[in-house]
Amino acid sequence: MIDLSPLVRRLAGTPLASWSQGLQAQLEAKLEKGHGDLDRWRGALQALPTLQPSEIDLVNGLRLDCDCDDATRAQMRQALMGLSPWRKGPFDLFGVHVDTEWHSDWKWSRVSPHLNLKGKRVLDVGCGNGYYQWRMLGAGADMVIGVDPNWLFFCQFQAVQQYLPELPAWHLPFALEDLPANLEGFDTVFSMGVFYHRRSPIEHLLALKDCLVKGGELVLETLVIEGDENQVLVPEDRYAQMRNVWYLPSVPALARWLRRAGFSDVRCVDVSVTSVEEQRSTEWMRYQSLGDFLDPNDHSKTLEGLPAPRRATLLARK
């Protein structure tokens, strides 16, 4: 059983205290429903060797290390491989380099210089396997809660968390919709790589705003197109072979949507075209990746003939 009492204690005396009281029951109800592969993934977690990190680096990447022999390292590698595919990372765990599909460290290096997370209570919506949560702690966050309903990501987070049990990071297998309205308890809320999957983008922005304290900051990272404030791409069917992509606004259009949703001090801090070096298939993620979804003769377009993935990060204040 995953014991959330440390989280409840951490949130005592904060605006999130009453919400925290029901989290254990909510988590156990989710675990009871579970997933067909959950037992297999739990087996991989149980196969991880018992180690105590003597070196922890969450600032320059995500690296844990200690003196361990080749057999222990091989055991670590096999157990982690049992949690494939690994999408966000990379992780360096006791000499095992988990070469994930995404170079999430590149994105973090673009975004983090614009943030001040020191002492902040942070929510990461659609947190994936928690890679960014650890980096947020490395940047000085007081605590980080991540929510993502994907069970494999939940187990991947547990794989790292079992070596960092004292650090104030928690992964809840919840969707944003599972959080109560008007939480108003987080200093910073992240939504990275989620917005374009939402059928109702303004509703998503309002739900994110609900999670923030007054004066809190939203960090929104999403797919965009070039153009003015009236330009928005709505794919006819698929985008880069994804069926669940709904809205790709221009940066000025997205800024307007944020203002319309009641945010202020809206600013874009980064725009970058995603390269096939930043997102690609690896030994740890053997399925198709970005290179398979672009026009082979023109990487500025997707297979559908639409503009290739371009991502922007906008900051806004409640």
UniProtKB/Swiss-Prot annotation:
Residues the record lists as binding carboxy-S-adenosyl-L-methionine: 88, 102, 107, 126, 176-177, 192, 196, 311
GO molecular function: methyltransferase activity; transferase activity, transferring alkyl or aryl (other than methyl) groups
Pfam families: Methyltransf_9 (PF08003)
Alphabetical list of CDD domains matching this protein: AdoMet_MTases
EC number: 2.5.1.-
InterPro entries with a match to the protein in the record: CmoB, Mo5U34_MeTrfas-like, SAM-dependent_MTases_sf
UniProtKB keywords: Transferase, tRNA processing
One biological process term in Gene Ontology: tRNA wobble uridine modification
Class of enzymatic activity (EC top level): transferase
Catalysed reaction, written as an equation: carboxy-S-adenosyl-L-methionine + 5-hydroxyuridine(34) in tRNA = 5-carboxymethoxyuridine(34) in tRNA + S-adenosyl-L-homocysteine + H(+)
Quaternary context: Homotetramer.
NCBIfam families, A to Z: PRK15068.1 (NF011650), tRNA 5-methoxyuridine(34)/uridine 5-oxyacetic acid(34) synthase CmoB (TIGR00452)
Function summary: Catalyzes carboxymethyl transfer from carboxy-S-adenosyl-L-methionine (Cx-SAM) to 5-hydroxyuridine (ho5U) to form 5-carboxymethoxyuridine (cmo5U) at position 34 in tRNAs.
Family: Belongs to the class I-like SAM-binding methyltransferase superfamily. CmoB family.
Protein name: tRNA U34 carboxymethyltransferase
Natural source organism: Pseudomonas putida (strain GB-1)
